[in-house]
């Protein structure tokens, strides 16, 4: 049985009415309008221009043409991690473009958080390597049943892709359509407004964003991407998760429980 791939997922234990706008597959501008006030304020300089209008027209047009565009809740990461809660930023590239089967229904792998997948979806290889590194750093079993990272997001880990939508089965299909300017603006605004954050930049794509952080009081951690193609070139053994917590504690912020599900 295949699920309706255009139907938005409702988060577990959600109030049926409280997050209706956040989880609807609505026009892109409507999803922005439903963001928490703090994010709308930070994003205000990034939106309202011709390039944003063109991006909205593109994404909305792809959906209107019947193309499955993932994720449904484009700004799920921003709903789970308000700007005044952010302590760590992990940058991804673009959303997963595949699907998984949960309870006999086909659903998107992407659900609006970089590297994360919904409960029940098979843990992708890059995320398995992330869990492996955490296990090595903390002396814990690296295998987790779920690849859902919402628990991290609720602790203040912003799991942000630099491109926020993708067509099913077509990796990087929404790259160079305007998302990069939006997320660059968001990263810069966040770095200017929040002190002593940790930015984890894995792989050359994420590391290209380092220029947005120069001269600002943040901890910037760089390593190869956790993909199986590059993880053994320095991601595994990088020590980033302990380094992040050491930085946070030195600056009077609570550590992240990386072992939490």
Question: Predicted regions span which residues?
Answer:
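Polybasic, low-complexity association/targeting segments
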Residues: 2-15, 21-61
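A polyanion-binding, active-site-adjacent surface
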Residues: 37-198, 205-208, 213-222, 226-231, ...
């Amino acid at each position: 049985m295949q699920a309706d791939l255009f139907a938005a997922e409702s988060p577990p234990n959600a109030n049926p009415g409280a997050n209706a706008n956040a989880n609807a597959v609505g026009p892109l501008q409507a999803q922005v309008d439903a963001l928490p006030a703090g994010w709308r304020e930070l994003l205000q300089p990034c939106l309202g221009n011709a390039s944003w209008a063109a991006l909205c027209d593109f994404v909305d047009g792809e959906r209107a043409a019947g193309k499955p565009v993932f994720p449904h809740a484009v700004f799920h990461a921003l709903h789970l991690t308000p700007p005044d809660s952010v302590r760590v930023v992990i940058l991804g590239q673009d959303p997963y473009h595949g699907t998984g089967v949960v309870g006999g229904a086909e659903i998107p792998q992407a659900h609006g958080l970089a590297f994360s997948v919904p409960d029940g979806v098979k843990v992708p290889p890059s995320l398995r390597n992330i869990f492996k590194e955490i296990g090595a750093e903390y002396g814990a079993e690296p295998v987790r049943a779920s690849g859902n990272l919402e628990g991290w997001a609720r602790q203040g880990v912003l799991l942000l892709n630099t491109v926020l939508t993708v067509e099913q089965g077509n990796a990087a299909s929404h790259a160079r359509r305007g998302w990069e300017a939006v997320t660059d603006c968001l990263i810069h605004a966040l770095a200017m407004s929040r002190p002593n954050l940790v930015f984890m930049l894995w792989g050359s794509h994420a590391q290209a964003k380092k220029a947005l952080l120069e001269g600002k009081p943040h901890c910037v951690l760089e390593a190869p991407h956790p993909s199986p193609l590059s993880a053994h070139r320095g991601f595994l053994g990088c020590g980033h998760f302990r380094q992040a917590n050491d930085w946070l504690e030195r600056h009077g912020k609570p550590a992240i429980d990386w072992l939490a599900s």
